[in-house]
A protein has these predicted regions:
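Terminal, non-globular segments
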Residues: 1-175
Length: 175
């Protein structure tokens, strides 16, 4: 990735993190809230690959953790994995497919919700499973899917297309 591309991507992640904390997280619709930063990180992972996706996920999650004064590292870890998963999906299946952002955002929203719940539970925080995994996750999934394609198009326009990566066809284990 070039330096100007990395700077543009960093600005997009920072703006998305600020919007997430200041505006978007306060808009609760049907019990769930849109996760704009997750959609942006997934889009960057699809466009740039697994390593940049993980880096931008960590950076965006760290900004959110610092601004909300939540348990430091939970959002960072969840978004790091989300960016990595999206990048691997883009590298292995072809990021040019029209439905790739929808599939990635849908699957990663569910995985991030479950993983976030498990992290909070393992840290001993009071989390109600029904609320975290049903009441909040289902509307969040619907909202994320609703805005996945427009946000992905906006991110692609802002940061440009990533380098052409040929899909991985096989993996060799070296001993």
């Amino acid at each position: 990735m070039t330096v100007p591309g990395a700077l543009r991507s960093s600005v997009v992640v920072f703006v998305a993190a600020m919007l997430q904390v200041v505006i978007v997280s306060a808009l609760v619709i049907g019990g769930g809230a849109l996760d704009l930063l997750l959609i942006v990180v997934v889009s960057l992972g699809l466009l740039r690959g697994s390593l940049p996706g993980a880096v931008f996920g960590f950076a965006g999650g760290l900004v959110v953790d610092l601004l909300t004064l939540d348990t430091l590292g939970i959002t960072s870890l969840v978004l790091t994995l989300a960016g990595f998963w999206a990048g691997r999906y883009g590298e292995t299946t072809g990021r040019d497919r029209r439905k790739a952002p929808l599939v990635a955002v849908g699957a990663i929203t569910i995985l991030a919700g479950v993983f976030g719940f498990l992290l909070h539970y393992l840290l001993g925080e009071d989390v109600v499973a029904r609320h975290a995994l049903v009441t909040a996750l289902v509307p969040t999934l619907a909202l994320n899917l609703l805005l996945a394609l427009p946000v992905h198009a906006l991110v692609r326009r802002s940061v440009g297309e990533g380098p052409a990566v040929e899909p991985v066809r096989e993996v060799e284990v070296v001993v």
